[in-house]
From Swiss-Prot:
This is KN motif and ankyrin repeat domain-containing protein 2. It comes from Rattus norvegicus. Residues 420-433 have a biased composition (Pro residues). Residues 665-831 are annotated as: Interaction with NCOA1. InterPro entries: Ankyrin_rpt (IPR002110), Ankyrin_rpt-contain_sf (IPR036770), KANK1-4 (IPR047184), KN_motif (IPR021939). Residues 1-32, 161-182, 414-473, 502-581 are annotated as: Disordered. Phosphorylated by casein kinase II upon estrogen stimulation. Phosphorylation induces the release by KANK2 of NCOA1 and its translocation to the nucleus where NCOA1 can activate gene transcription.
Amino acid sequence: MAQVLHVPAPFPGTPGQASSAAFPNKEPDPPYSVETPYGYRLDLDFLKYVDDIEKGHTLRRVPVQRRPRLGSLPRGPGSWWTSTESLCSDASGDSRHSAYSYCGRGFYPQYGALETRSGTNPRVERTLLDARRRLEDQAAAPSSGGLGSLTPSAAGSTSSLAGVGLLPPTPRSSGLSTPVAPSAGHLAHVREQMAGALRKLRQLEEQVKLIPVLQVKLSVLQEEKRQLTVQLKSQKFLGHPSGTRSRSELCLDLPEAPDDPAVLETRSVGTWVRERDLGIPDGEAALVAKVAVLETQLKKALQELRAAQTQQVDLQPQAWPPPDTQVRVDTVRVVEGPREVEVAASTAAGAPAQRAQSLEPYGAGLKALATSAENTLVFRSHEVVETMCPLPTASTSNMHTAKKISITERNCTGAARMADPPPSPAEPSPSSPYPAAEPENPAPAAQDTTDRELTRPVASQDSQAAEGAGGASLGVQSALKRKEVPADPDVHQRNLQFVGINGGYESSSEDSSTAENSEHESTENEAPEPPVRVLSTAEGPQLRPLGPAVGKTSQDERQLSQESQRVPEAKVAPGPDPEEEIRMDLSPDLISACLALEKYLENPNALTERELKVAYTTVLQEWLRLACRSDAHPELVRRHLVTFRAMSARLLDYVVNIADSNGNTALHYSVSHANFPVVRQLLDSGVCQVDKLNRAGYSPIMLTALATLKTQDDIDTILQLFRLGNVNAKASQAGQTALMLAVSHGRVDVVKALLACEVDVNMQDEDGSTALMCACEHGHKEITGLLLAVPSCDISLTDRDGSTALMVALDAGQSEIASMLYSRMNIKCSFAPMSDYESPASSSAEE
């Protein structure tokens, strides 16, 4: 049963008013809030606000005032509704039996203040009028007795709570009867409505929070729009196209119309399309297809190139002899003239029955000697030799010089049988004093005469000057030796081989004769005749590798012949020497790298960075492999140095002093390995930097303290090294000198050599130590005596700790050395300086 509560006290804020029950003729105050069955009180403005939100009329927020619990209701006078149906939802008719409705507006003081400030709120007035009208209608309607009839609430007909009919109101005569308990469905419906209203309110609050962020974004976008507009106007003013287009954009740029009112204005329109819609192939696929086409073209070009090379080789079958033949063609040109020496170029080897032809059609005497071998050749090597031979003449004013270039092929066994074919016919040359061989006379008499005259030298001023130079010359010393061939009753073959020509290429001059040519052999073995002079390339600046060497101009060969005047005499070797059989093979990579470096040294901009790096790496690896090993051969090093000098003097300087990643040069490695023959070859080049420091801060002179001197040649080599460099140089690490290092390692021979080169014995390192202190500390008595024998040796020097050499010896327990120092200090005897260096080898020989 719904219980109607009548309170006689007036509603707060409206004093003097009584309840509607006390004044039946007076209209009751309009209700302004409603209490829910579970203790909450809802404001009518809030309900109206929720209803407006559902209908989408407004987004304004209406403040919601939450009422305290039922126990905290004010006790003052007020107007109470007589039914729980007031201002409740029409769909929840059962809720009117479970709660009280407090409808006085004076309960919320803020509303009174609001009315006082801004007057009457129209929305509140409409709500109140609506509620008052409904109350009047319900009061005028006939009321039925019973507990189920309740006075309808004014708020039950609001637009926000509709949908379900009202239950019969409670009669007014019921008084304070007990209200009917609300049903569960009514409560659930109210809860759902409240939850929905709260959810909508939360969503609206979140949207309100986003308003400042959106306003900031809007301002940023407006600023960007303004900047883009300004930029667009400036670009249009300057005549530049606006913006950048992507790769797939199709843009039509139409020229602007002139300032003519009769012509319509046009504008540029950009249309976005896709590449596949336009039929344009994909960029990556197009590149792949293009690469495939280029690869196909490259393969075809390579095939054509190979075919052309094959045809070129087929068109020149006579450039070299067939594989199963053995041919040697010698071309000799003799020129008479007092001023310069002209040398004929060599012809290539031809077929066995082919006549040899000279490269120069004038003044050439040709001698062709072709032999055929019965057995098959396994290996053949092409060799080129250039020899300079002075020729006898009737007049002493003119000198005839012939340059003989021999191209030979030999088998690996060296025992091929060779027959005597008839010599090739040749026309006698007016400039040649030697008759050519006649075709009808195959006897070797003419050949013997020519060979004898060619190999018999005549003493000249150049040869005398070379003999006077002796071993001081840097020229190539080539040995002339004879190859012994097993005796054969039919043919006797003799080979004269020159070793050391053209940077290490062996050269041979073969003469085939019968057993009757004893006169030719005896002529070559005569004692009064001096040995044959050989062409040198030690100082020749025009030397090139084997391929370009054949067929050079006469001017280049003339320069080579002029440089050959410095060559000393050749020595006749009684037998084969393993050192003479060493061959120098210059790889094509090394040759090309040397030529590239030569270009770079002449013009630093001639090579790219990659080409320079490749050339530098190749030369460095080949040179270090050749000269920096412990078993490096001095002859190979010398021949490479000759080749580098022939290419360029700058190239020689660059290669000799090239260093690895640790700063070590070939001289550093050679001295460390005690390979003094290679050290001498490097020093003889004249471009070796003997004072160059490595990354550790040591020079080659300092590294001699680690080497062991075995022979007198080793001592002479280090003496040459010391004289070329600075023996007083200090290491960058501790400031030690070569003398200090030699004393510390106990190298007596090196100490003697340094003293012979007038080294400063009083130099101090970073700690203030001298060589004498080092000898005293390590207990080297002999070295101490050598140092004390130097008159300039100062034994009173102190180190950083204030210790003298005597104190160092006493601290080390070297009593004998301390006695020597004490005697030197007291007696002050002076020893004679070392005027001459005496080597251990010579001293042992005297004993």
